A protein has these predicted regions:
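Non-catalytic, topology-defining segments of multipass membrane proteins
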Residues: 2, 8-12, 20-124, 133, ...
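Active-site-proximal inter-transmembrane loops
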Residues: 227-234, 298-320
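Histidine-centered catalytic micro-motifs
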Residues: 130-140, 167-179, 283-290, 314-330, ...
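Post-HEXXH active-site segment of zinc metalloproteases
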Residues: 143-157, 336-341
Length: 523
């Protein structure tokens, strides 16, 4: 599995301008030079996670690389990252009520033609809108309460036939390597695109049988390379047990259908993941289809579309998809406000679903003929005109006192409760946090999973969330408390002396022998 190396102790911050991407064209966007590109329009690439393009992507520096982020005021971003329970609860209750109402109507009208539109609505809410619930709760940003996110995520995972642990790690990889061939497991339309495959996806007739096959295979303990590449070894057993639970539930529904001599049970559980998938694909095809592969700029590989309020409810604002990929720590209900903050740095959004579909299908037709064809680039500010680390807070620069291993940080009133600040001690990156009870905590400044700068993250009392993959740490102990973060942060004791904050940094002597790693910007 292509995991980040172990990161312990302080991480060396670059002193120069933000690192440039591996290869930069005239707009400042990194692109991989496609080998063997000739005048021939047919160049078939390997989208496998263990194929030749995977090796090329890693060698080119695309794995967990630096992505462009639009400038935004850090205080405003902090407000936008705040999660609530009320709004997502209302949305969840309304969705479940509509689902239950459609299901009840479908049951009561069995044997009449009225049952057809009732099941159509039920399926769309189950196999279509359920995808948005799976996605938002999978990020852990919908609800403030972790248990609510996890409960909704697991329910929606079953509805979508997606094994929870496998798909959580798959989506983490998608955010790390969006549309990077050989690294992104969720490239829905591969080049050259098959228009027949696209059509069949509207009924889940391509991915659906594959997912059912994986559930059966995993339930019997057979784990293929795809799963082993994505999921850490210590989580593979969980994949097996989740598959067994899913298989047991599906077999139970199938047995009920056989016993009753009717397909009705399957129309309520199992088949909605197929006949309702048209709504999933109706929205999802607008996210990335036809856009550029192998670019480290979401503005080139992701699409934002303006849609009506009903669609935004069904889709949970994922039409603001560029914004979501740049700032995945922002909950879905704050994405419209985030869009207003950064839209000057983004390409013009598609004005409607029709506008988006015209672009998507024109691109698919052209790329079917010539895989190298690209959508003419919309205007975006060149990278050179926007400072790539403009969302980063200004670091407090301090040094350890000779012989003491201690560093003075500043007055005890340096931060208000709930605030955090980046600190650079002897050139290494750390983060100072103040919990709601007024206590200070001092930890490494770079995530142990995705090498993201934690000072760009979200502090909720004593829990610090990484801005890149939503992994979380308890700043009091350094413990990783939410995946994908697994390795703890190093922590350092902070004391108050004569109204001044002092941190003891003796552990830094051990850090000095460890490899230095540049703190990556996130996107």
């Amino acid at each position: 599995m292509l995991l980040d190396g172990d990161l312990w102790g302080g991480i060396r911050l670059p002193r120069t301008e933000p690192s440039r991407c591996p290869r930069v064209h005239d707009e400042g966007v990194a692109m991989r030079d496609r080998e063997n590109q000739t005048d021939s329009p047919v160049v078939r690439r390997s989208y496998s996670l263990v194929g030749p393009d995977t090796k090329k992507a890693v060698e080119a520096g695309f794995d967990n690389a630096e992505w462009y982020r639009a400038p935004i005021d850090t205080d405003r971003l902090k407000v936008l990252m705040i999660r609530r329970n009320g709004r997502p609860a209302v949305d969840a209750v309304l969705w479940l009520a509509l689902l239950g109402g459609a299901g009840t109507l479908a049951f009561l009208t069995l044997g009449t033609w009225w049952t057809v539109p009732a099941f159509a609505v039920f399926g769309a809410l189950w196999g279509g809108s359920g995808d948005a619930r799976w996605h938002e709760n999978g990020h852990g940003t919908a609800f403030r309460s972790r248990w609510a996110n996890d409960a909704m995520y697991n329910i929606a995972s079953f509805m979508m036939l997606r094994e929870p642990t496998l798909w959580r790690w798959s989506h983490i990889r998608h955010h790390s390597n969006t549309l990077i061939v050989g690294l992104d497991p969720e490239i829905g339309i591969q080049r050259p695109p098959s228009l027949l495959t696209v059509a069949l996806n509207y009924l889940n007739l391509i991915n659906g049988p594959k997912m059912l096959g994986k559930i059966v295979m995993h339930a019997f303990g057979h784990l293929e390379d795809f799963t082993r590449v994505l999921v850490p070894a210590d989580k593979l057993r969980r994949v097996v047990w989740e598959a067994r639970v899913f298989l047991l539930l599906l077999v139970g529904v199938l047995a009920a259908a056989v016993e009753l001599g009717t397909i009705v049970p399957l129309l309520f559980v199992g088949l909605p993941s197929f006949y309702g998938a048209w709504l999933l694909w109706f929205f999802a095809i607008t996210q990335h289809a036809g856009l550029r592969e192998d670019v480290l700029d979401h503005r080139m590989s992701t699409r934002t579309v303006y849609i009506n309020p009903v669609f935004r409810f069904l889709y949970l604002n994922m039409n603001y998809h560029v914004e979501h990929h740049m700032f995945p720590a922002v909950p879905y209900y704050n994405l419209p406000a985030l869009h207003e903050e950064i839209k000057a740095y983004l390409p013009p959004p598609k004005t409607s679903m029709l506008d988006a579909y015209l672009e998507v299908f024109h691109a698919l037709v052209m790329q079917h003929k010539d895989v190298t064809w690209e959508i003419p680039k919309s205007w975006v500010p060149p990278v050179e005109s926007t400072k790539q680390d403009s969302t980063a807070r200004e670091a407090l620069l301090v040094a350890t006192a000779p012989g003491s291993g201690e560093a003075e940080l500043g007055p005890s009133s340096l931060l208000a409760p709930g605030e955090l600040a980046p600190v650079e001690v002897d050139g290494l990156a750390y983060v100072l946090c103040r919990t709601l009870d007024g206590s200070y905590a001092f930890t490494d400044g770079v995530c142990t999973h995705g090498r993201a700068r934690l000072s760009d993250g979200f502090l909720d009392d004593c829990i610090l969330e990484c801005p890149k993959h939503n992994g979380r740490f308890d700043v009091r102990t350094g413990e990783a408390v939410r995946l994908p973060a697994q390795k703890p942060l190093c922590t350092y004791p902070v004391t108050e002396r004569d109204g001044r904050l002092v941190v003891r940094m003796r552990e830094i002597e051990e850090s000095a022998a460890r490899p230095e790693v540049s703190a990556e910007r996130t996107g």
